[in-house]
Regions:
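Active-site-proximal alpha-helix that buttresses catalytic centers in soluble enzyme cores
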Residues: 2-69
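Short, acidic/turn-prone active-site loops that include or flank metal/cofactor-
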Residues: 24, 76-79, 167-170
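Short beta-strand scaffold positions
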Residues: 52-53, 123, 142-143
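Active-site signature of alpha/beta-hydrolase-fold catalytic machinery across serine-
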Residues: 64, 150-154
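Phosphate-handling substructures
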Residues: 65-124
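Domain-level recognition of soluble alpha/beta enzyme cores
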Residues: 158-184
Length: 187
């Protein structure tokens, strides 16, 4: 089975280096157009099944790349809820926030105030992707950078920065049953 994980297209949040996970912000119009053109090159794998997290940026990206295909919404693949840090930038804002500084001491385990921890996001992401793997059908999931990174670390080891896909890029993972064998970069 081939499982393709693609990060949604560029948003105002990614352009401004904001912490945005739960915020349902759109892909920039020019980024959608760039994805449409990139898709014409054939760089994106196709599949028999498509999934999104349900946030508009994932649905917009799916349609920009694959057109009007049917899809399944898997809310468990939504990005981390940064709680009180949502839609805020580090520079000039969060760098002075004592709660943010405390969270940064262990971002993998500390919970964002009124949000989630990376461990909580990984647990729900793994639970959400397990039925897809059990089905065994080639699948494309248009999701989020943090979720993609977490799943890749879970399957292949490493650290967050080993698997931080840029908008519109990702990985194709080859599975034998539910066992990940290897991966290639997409985009």
């Amino acid at each position: 089975m081939k499982l393709t994980l693609l990060r949604h297209g560029e948003t105002e949040g990614s352009r401004r280096d904001l912490y945005y996970g739960a915020a349902d912000i759109p892909v920039l119009p020019e980024a959608l157009e760039a994805l449409r053109h990139k898709a014409l090159t054939g760089i994106y794998p196709t599949a028999g099944h498509y999934c999104v997290s349900g946030l508009q940026r994932t649905i917009q990206t799916l349609h920009a790349i694959y057109g009007d295909v049917g899809y399944t919404v898997l809310p468990g693949l939504r990005e981390m809820d940064f709680g009180d840090f949502e839609m805020r930038a580090y520079a000039g804002d969060l760098e002075h926030d004592p709660q943010f500084i405390a969270w940064c001491e262990d971002v993998e385990h500390n919970i964002c105030p009124h949000g989630e921890s990376a461990a909580q996001v990984l647990a729900r992401s793994v639970a959400a992707i397990e039925p897809v793997l059990r089905r065994g059908e080639d699948t494309v999931c248009v999701i989020h950078g943090g979720v993609t990174s977490g799943l890749m670390i879970h399957w292949f080891g490493g650290i967050l920065y080993d698997y931080s896909p840029a908008p519109g890029t990702g990985y194709q993972v080859i599975f034998d049953g539910e066992k990940p064998l290897n991966y290639t970069n997409i985009g």
